[in-house]
Amino acid sequence: MTDLFKPLPEPPTELGRLRVLSKTAGIRVSPLILGGASIGDAWSGFMGSMNKEQAFELLDAFYEAGGNCIDTANSYQNEESEIWIGEWMASRKLRDQIVIATKFTGDYKKYEVGGGKSANYCGNHKRSLHVSVRDSLRKLQTDWIDILYIHWWDYMSSIEEVMDSLHILVQQGKVLYLGVSDTPAWVVSAANYYATSHGKTPFSVYQGKWNVLNRDFERDIIPMARHFGMALAPWDVMGGGRFQSKKAMEERKKNGEGLRTFVGGPEQTELEVKISEALTKIAEEHGTESVTAIAIAYVRSKAKNVFPLIGGRKIEHLKQNIEALSIKLTPEQIEYLESIVPFDVGFPKSLIGDDPAVTKKLSPLTSMSARIAFDN
């Protein structure tokens, strides 16, 4: 009986200090999400090799460190990612402990049936959604998906068809929460307005590309997420592995390795070198050599409910990523990082400014007519 009121032990790492996903999704998730794009060996030609044993070791390390949220997609590694994650959860008897997120939209059968024969295995339409979820449930060896994302907006299905079809899956219990990835803010806003106006399930989380070098999120995505109470799950936070310190790049060259990424050559671009040097400087101020930890800490400092996706194939990289959770950047450090590559917010923010409720500053136009305090 005394154990009933006994305080919980501290988590093994800060990864185990869970957070509520968003205002519209009360599920508790780890502050970093393990990305499943590298889990599998079908794409080894451009992502590096990872066999099943290595994948299970990485998944074990993530879970043992306190992580509970894993992100994948129907098409990753020609379906191996979902299959291996499903096998891992089943072999460890951990399905109920894991928050699994997957995606539909991508053509996940082209490799099997051939080009031109897989048209209805992709897209945002109801048929694509139906077969994708059917197959994802089988591959993941589960009865439900915690978070289902639209992988990207294909402009070929109406918002009404998409949101109605997704809501049916939620009603059936096959999906619990909805997310959207790589989609214009106006589409997400229209979709969430339609959903909430018609008693349907809205999107609770947005996933997209965001890092200190690519800050397009700040134009419309972050304000949209703030308005609808959505979480943000940025990918490419580490620049696709291209944010590397000078020391790390020299080590790679010594070992005969280049940068292995989706895009870009084996060498860093001039901008990547500059931002890597800036990240290295801030890392030294925090007593670490991990550039990636600073890159993760940066996006976490920019908005509420930010859950960065972390990838990679090595446990040592996972440990570096977890280190970010103990780092809090100062306003001066954030300002320094952002000064390396100036960001143009574009019109209309360049004219009217940002939301004064967030910035605590009046817009340039309003300040000419009124004096307003922001004490609340």
From Swiss-Prot:
Pfam families: Aldo_ket_red. Disulfide bonds: none annotated. Substrate binds at H151. SUPFAM superfamilies: NAD(P)-linked oxidoreductase. Keywords: NADP, Oxidoreductase. Its EC number is 1.1.1.-. GO terms for biological process: aldehyde metabolic process. The record marks K103 as: Lowers pKa of active site Tyr. The keyword NADP applies. The keyword Cytoplasm does not apply. GO terms for molecular function: aryl-alcohol dehydrogenase (NADP+) activity. The active site is at Y76 (proton donor). It is an enzyme of class 1 (oxidoreductase). NADP(+) binds at D236, V237, M238, G239, G240, G241, R242, F243, Q244, S245, K246. Belongs to the aldo/keto reductase family. Aldo/keto reductase 2 subfamily. This is Putative aryl-alcohol dehydrogenase AAD14. It comes from Saccharomyces cerevisiae (strain ATCC 204508 / S288c). The lineage of its organism: Eukaryota, Fungi, Dikarya, Ascomycota, Saccharomycotina.
